[in-house]
């Protein structure tokens, strides 16, 4: 169908279903998709359309680079999180975002509370983040809007943060976490050297 103000210039083939942890299984699934996408491009070319293809999210884009000359479109581009770092070991992601918070109380001998509630970190994943330096040593008790209560696992009680101590939480899902803040502080060699404004959090419909 002809539309006077619309031109077909490309295909955006996002395949979020292929976020498979095993790299060989991921590559196998994406190989099938690339074949389909190439066939579609060939059919469109017969009809007179020269199109580009944009494909591949954060877990998938390295596979597309091996299999095609498509443009790739990783969504988690600047700051990696604990979710992708754990799920895709083959990609050797380094966590590059954390939330600075503080231990505000010791409800009992095992538990401690951080001032990092659901207002401070994305609440969509079941495990919303990990405490840097205490990975695997704590259990989550509860989280509400302002606070997050943890329990030290048996044998690690001596590592419980002191009241007033600064603690760093690495989010499981950085994308909606970053949208909760107007800017991010940039740290290099343990020193704050600048800040980045989070422009994408300011959304507005203009039509």
Model-derived features with residue positions:
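C-terminal accessory subdomain/extension
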Residues: 108-207
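Active-site loop ensemble at the mouth of alpha/beta enzyme cores that anchors a bound cofactor
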Residues: 59-136
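Short Gly/Pro-enriched turn/cap motifs at secondary-structure boundaries
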Residues: 33, 92-94, 138-142
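Active-site loop/helix belt of alpha/beta enzymes
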Residues: 1-91
């Amino acid at each position: 169908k002809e539309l006077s103000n619309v031109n077909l210039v490309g295909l955006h083939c996002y395949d979020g279903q292929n976020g498979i942890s095993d790299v060989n299984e991921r590559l196998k699934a994406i190989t099938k998709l690339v074949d389909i996408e190439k066939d579609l491009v060939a059919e469109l070319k017969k009809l007179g359309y020269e199109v580009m293809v944009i494909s591949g999210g954060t877990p998938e884009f390295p596979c597309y680079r091996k299999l095609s000359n498509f443009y790739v479109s990783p969504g988690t581009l600047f700051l990696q999180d604990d979710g992708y770092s754990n799920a895709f070991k083959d990609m050797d992601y380094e966590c590059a975002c954390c939330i600075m918070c503080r231990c505000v109380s010791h409800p009992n001998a095992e538990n401690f509370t951080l001032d990092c509630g659901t207002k401070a970190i994305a609440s969509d994943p079941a495990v919303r983040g990990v405490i840097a330096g205490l990975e695997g040593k704590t259990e989550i008790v509860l989280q509400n809007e302002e606070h997050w209560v943890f329990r030290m696992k048996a044998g690690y009680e001596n590592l419980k943060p002191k009241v007033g101590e600064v603690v760093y939480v690495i989010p499981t899902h950085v994308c909606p976490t970053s949208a909760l803040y107007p800017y991010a502080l940039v740290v290099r060699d343990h020193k704050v050297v600048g800040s980045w404004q989070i422009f994408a959090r300011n959304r507005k419909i203009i039509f």
